[in-house]
UniProtKB/Swiss-Prot annotation:
Annotated control of activity: GAP activity stimulated by phosphatidylinositol 4,5-bisphosphate (PIP2) and phosphatidic acid.
Matches recorded under PROSITE patterns: ANK_REP_REGION (PS50297), ANK_REPEAT (PS50088), ARFGAP (PS50115), PH_DOMAIN (PS50003)
Comp. bias regions, Low complexity: 379-388
Protein name: Arf-GAP with coiled-coil, ANK repeat and PH domain-containing protein 2
Gene3D superfamilies the record matches: Ankyrin repeat-containing domain, Arf GTPase activating protein, Arfaptin homology (AH) domain/BAR domain, Pleckstrin-homology domain (PH domain)/Phosphotyrosine-binding domain (PTB)
Primary gene name: ACAP2
SMART domains xrefs: ANK, ArfGap, PH
Positions of the Arf-GAP domain: 399-521
GO MF, any single term: GTPase activator activity
Region (Disordered) location: 365-390, 520-576
Length: 781
């Protein structure tokens, strides 16, 4: 309620003035009580809100812990992390709201009470004091006798001075009242308006935040619906399988009895057996036994290192034991000791005895073949299928994938945080990672990083060789080029996961630390290729190589290149022979005088796609990684070179590792050039057996025909390349077998898998054995 005190009434000091003062003073006292109460309620609200934010933050930490626990499930980890980050932003918005509430309500209203109302109270005290003095002066003036002239003058002077002081203080008091009445409205409304604007900002920020999250939540909902459908289908399948298993007759043994001498994981047979201890009590303990790598080993728990019972099965024998009380026993005897074992049934005992005997025979056979294979290794006419067992033996006895990869410069520590002894790798980037950073990489998606264990997963030879061609030092020189310049601190092994995650996303997803390429000083069309005229003599000599992008030998990049070779050609002789071979196949004929040799600019002047295209031919893996970091499209098409792709260029360059690198980074194995030839066509024409094997394993379409109506098989038959013909026919036969067996057929014939595995091993470790096509022709007069 607004009450205005009139200045005229103030001078009169009338009863109306006194009544107005009394009303104003009561109103101000009530206002003070209301404001004090509101401030206390505001403080309680802010404290409660901060407690809510603290509890909410603890809840967010719980979600993050759950996300970290689910690091092996990319869907759960990614979504929980994103949701926790969003809710953390809402907590921040709540804290901002409470801070603004404290400033707008608590601070402003407390200031009004402590300053403005306090001034009113001080003015009231002075007014009451001078009013009392005036009343005393009036009473004294009235009591003075007429005949006492001296007292009359003194009383009159005091009364005059008191009235003058009263009027001055009364006017100040009235002014303070009117100012307070006017100011309180603006102060109260201003604080409330500021409070409401704080809420407006809070809800607006929340709306914007969840508007961005909306499509993501919608996509997740669709994924959950699909997961529910898949879960229902899996449940039905499991119930059906459960019913089928229940209907089977398990009156006999319920343990798998098969053994496989050529198992991919090297384990011939495994299962539980009782083992008699060698102590004085001869106790029997149940352990998990396995036959692997020509050894008999056992372990109690999976995390325990296997205990070797027999180091070399060739030095032992196995026999039945019928002279002891326990049933189903057999004994494995070596020159130094014997081991008494017991199976659960007679069938299992016979299976184990047969598995040990077969493993002994296999070990002797492999040992006997070693000398013959060593002799055949030096012969140029050695069959391509003869070295498969040798290669497998070499890998079994050689260094492990972990040892080979970690010996590359920089690979002994995590590429992103520096933790020692990393046991995970990103195979498309070519780096080693610790387990925490590998979980973050896995959350990025396979289009950014493909994570694999160096100790738990199997490694194909071409992939292992790719890891040895790159390494942390090479990749960090590309992806951390501007790290010091930008002043960014690299995470340490002890850094928080959130800090590592932000750094890894900035490094590989946003590529913030990659050195930007300077703008080329040529037009976009000219930046693709620069054509230089050549003499007729130069054209004649370079004609066979025009399809290879015809890069001059002197223009080779000085940077590090892959040591991999798919064709084992020398600098001069093999190129000349290869050109004549290609001409004989009539698939790479010159297209008249229009084709000319192309010379590239420095890589800094190339667009990323052309940079990748050039580096793929030159077998320059660091340059290829740099081009991808600069945004090169892995399936970039060079319109000036018959729509060839980097993968086709890698085939022409003759590097198996380069092809593997492009495939790991998403290269399409079936994209064809202007003449209808894909990578498989080009590899077949050039006689690159290892590349043909790689492309077939990656799903290359061998039925596709080029503009001449030739598929890869007809090209290989025409060129009389026995190895490639064998691979193509085996792949086609395996494909037909799978189609005939239907959905539940076997994934592939064992012979097919063994042969392709042998070819992969030879292409990576002994490529010279796959070059019979070139070698036999070069020996012709």
């Amino acid at each position: 309620m607004k009450v205005t005190v009139d200045f005229e009434e103030c001078l009169k000091d009338s009863p109306r003035f006194r009544a107005a003062l009394e009303e104003v003073e009561g109103d101000v006292a009530e206002l003070e009580l209301k404001l004090d109460k509101l401030v206390k309620l505001c403080i309680a609200m802010i404290d409660t809100g901060k407690a809510f934010c603290l509890a909410n933050k603890q809840f967010m930490n719980g979600i993050r812990d759950l996300a970290q626990y689910s690091c092996k499930d990319a869907l759960v980890e990614t979504n929980l992390t994103k949701f926790s980050d969003t809710l953390q932003e809402m907590i921040n918005y709540h804290n901002i709201l409470f801070d603004q509430t404290q400033r707008s309500i608590k601070a402003q209203l407390q200031t009004f009470v402590k300053e403005d109302i306090k001034k009113f109270k001080d003015a009231k005290k002075q007014f009451e004091k001078v009013s009392e003095e005036k009343e005393n002066a009036l009473v004294k003036n009235a009591q003075v006798q007429r005949n006492k002239q001296h007292e009359v003058e003194e009383a009159t002077n005091i009364l005059t001075a008191t009235r003058k002081c009263f009027r001055h203080i009364a006017l100040d008091y009235v002014l303070q009242i009117n100012v307070l009445q006017s100011k309180r409205r603006s102060e109260i409304l201003k604080s409330m308006l500021s409070f409401m604007y704080a809420h407006l900002t809070f809800f607006h920020q929340g709306y914007d935040l969840f508007s961005e999250l909306g499509p993501y939540m919608k996509d997740l909902g669709a994924q959950l619906d699909q997961l529910a459908v898949d879960a229902a289908k899996e449940k039905r399948d499991m119930e059906q399988k459960h019913s089928t298993i229940q209907q089977k007759d398990y009156s006999g043994d319920d343990t798998k009895l098969e053994y496989n001498v050529d198992a991919a994981n090297g384990i011939v047979m495994e299962g539980y057996l009782f083992k008699r201890a060698s102590n004085a009590f001869k106790t029997w303990n149940r352990r998990w036994f396995s036959i692997q790598n020509n050894q008999l080993v056992y372990q109690k728990k999976f995390k325990d290192n296997p205990t070797v019972v027999v180091e070399d099965l060739r030095l032992c024998t196995v026999k039945h034991c019928e002279d002891i009380e326990r049933r189903f026993c057999f004994e494995v005897v070596s020159p130094t000791k014997s081991c008494m074992l017991q199976a659960d049934s007679e069938k299992l005992r016979q299976a184990w005895i047969k598995a040990v005997q077969t493993s002994i025979a296999t070990a002797y056979r492999e040992k006997g073949d070693e000398s013959e294979k060593q002799e055949k290794k030096s012969s140029p006419s050695t069959g391509s299928l003869e070295s498969g067992s040798e290669t497998k033996e070499k890998l079994l006895k050689g260094e492990s994938a972990l040892q080979r990869v970690q010996c590359i410069p920089g690979n002994a520590a995590c590429c992103d945080c520096g933790l020692a002894d990393p046991r995970w790798a990103s195979i498309n980037l070519g780096i080693t990672l610790c387990i925490e950073c590998s979980g973050i990489h896995r959350s990025l998606g396979v289009h950014f990083s493909k994570v694999r264990s160096l100790t738990l997963d199997s490694w194909e030879p071409e992939l292992l060789k790719l890891m040895c061609e790159l390494g942390n030092d090479v990749i960090n020189r590309i992806y951390e080029a501007k790290l010091e310049k930008m002043g960014v601190k690299k995470p340490q092994p002890g850094s928080q996961r959130q800090e590592k995650e932000m750094y890894i996303k900035a490094k590989y997803v946003e590529r913030k630390f990659v050195e930007k390429q300077p703008a080329a000083a040529v037009s976009p069309l000219e930046s693709r290729t620069k054509v230089l005229p050549q003499s007729q003599e130069e054209k004649r000599h370079s004609a066979p190589e025009k399809s290879f992008l015809a890069i001059e030998q002197g223009a080779a990049s000085p940077r590090v290149r892959s040591s991999d070779s798919g064709i084992q050609q020398s600098v001069d002789d093999s190129r000349e022979h290869l050109a004549s071979t290609i001409s004989a196949n009539s698939l790479y004929e010159p297209e008249g005088e229009k084709q000319e040799s192309s010379v590239f600019y420095d890589s800094r002047q190339l667009n990323p796609g052309l940079h990748l295209y050039r580096a793929a031919f030159e077998k320059n893996l660091p340059d290829m990684a740099e081009a991808l970091a600069h945004g090169a499209e892995v399936n970039w098409v060079n319109m000036e070179e018959n729509k060839a792709t980097p993968l086709i260029q890698a085939v022409r360059g003759g590097s198996l590792v380069t092809c593997e690198f492009l495939l790991q980074n998403g290269a399409n194995v079936n994209i064809r050039d202007m003449k209808g030839r894909g990578p498989l066509h080009h590899a077949t024409v050039l006689g690159h057996t290892g590349q043909v094997c790689l492309f077939l394993k990656r799903g290359a379409n061998q039925h596709a025909t080029d503009e001449d109506g030739k598929d890869p098989l007809s090209i290989a038959v025409e060129a009389a390349n026995a190895d490639i013909v064998t691979l193509l026919r085996l792949a086609r036969m395996n494909e037909e077998m799978r189609e005939s067996e239907g959905l539940y057929g076997q994934p592939g014939d064992e012979i097919y898998q063994d042969i392709f595995r042998d070819f992969s091993q030879m292409a990576s470790n002994n490529p010279e054995k796959l070059n019979r096509f070139q070698q036999s022709d070069s020996q012709k007069p």
